[in-house]
Amino acid sequence: MVGVHADPRITIVPWHGDGQQRLHAWRANVGEPVAFDVSRPPIASPVRELVVLSWNLWIGRARLEQVVARIRSQTDAPLVILAQEAYRSDASVPARAARRAGRRAAGGFPPRARARTDIVAAAHELGLNLRYVPSMRNGAGASDRGNAILSDLPLGHAWAFELPLVLQRRVPVGATLLLEGGPLHVVCAHLDPRGPPGAAWLGVAGRAAQATYLLEQVVGDTVILGADLNLGRGRRERAWRLLHEADFGAGVPPVLPSWRHTFHALPRLVLDYVLVRDRLGQLAAARIERLDEDPRDRGATVFGSDHHPLVARVRLRPAGQELS
C-alpha cells in the first residue's frame, strides 16, 4: 500500500503563526498522509459532467459505500468525494500518544460494536484515487481523522495546509483535476466548531481567522470547496462573508440552500456547504442538493453519520465555448 510514509504527491504547509508550538504536539500524535492511485481505464471522451460528494463521515461511522452506490445508480458521471472526519488506522499512527503530547488528541472516542470505515480501505474497495491528510489523533487509540479526497478522475499534485490553531489542529486538503477546459481545483476543509474557554468560546472569530487563511491558500479561479464550516451562527458569520467576497457561491448560478439543517443531531444547524468559484466561466452549471436517507428526514442518523451528505451535480463547459 502506498502512503504509510510521507508521499511526494502531497505538499503540506505548516502553520507558522500564533500557536505553532502547540501544533508540534498535535502533529506528533498522527500518522503519515496517504496518497495512492488505482489503475482505471482511461476516459475516452472529455469530461462533460462531474458529481462531487461532500460529507462529514463522523469519524468513520458513515456508510460511505451505500451513498456511493446510490449516486452510481443515478449517473455514470465521474465522482469526486470530499470527506471530512475521515477515519484511518494503520502502522504509521504512533501506538501511543507522545508523553508531552497526550493532551493534543481528540477526546471522547469509545470503542464501537460496529467497526468504523477506514478511508484507505474504502478507497481501495471503491476503486478510487485517494489523498488523505490527518488532522488529529482519535483519543488514546492508534488512529486519526482528517480530510480526504477520493476520485474517479486522475488527481494532480495535492496540497494541504494547517489552519490557524483555534481549538484543534485542522488541515484542509486540495487537489487539481486536469480537464479539457482547464484545471479544476477541489478542496476539502473542516473549521473549528468552537473556540477556547472564555469570550472566544463560540468560535466566531476563530472561524473567521481560519477562513481568511483558507482563502489565502486557495487561489485558483475554478474551485469546488466541500466543507463543514461549523457556522454556529449561520450565514451571519464573518467567515461566510469572507467566502462570499472571494467569489464563492452555492452553485452555478448560486442558490442559497433551502434546507434548514445539515447537522442531523440537536441543535439542527446548517454547518455543511459545497461552494463554487467559477471566475472563468468554466462551469456551465452546478446544482447542490442534500441527500436524505429517510424521505421524511427521520432517524437518529443519516446513512450512519450525524451530518447529511451534500451532492453537487456539475456540468462543464466544452473547451472554447464562449459564455452566452
Q: At which residue positions do the language-model features occur?
A:
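Active-site beta-strand/loop signature of hydrolases that rely on acidic residues for catalysis
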Residues: 50-57, 67, 71-113, 150, ...
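Short, solvent-exposed loop/turn segments at secondary-structure junctions
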Residues: 58-60, 86-89, 137-138, 153-156, ...
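Surface-exposed cleft-lining segments at the edges of enzyme active sites
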Residues: 159-164, 191-205
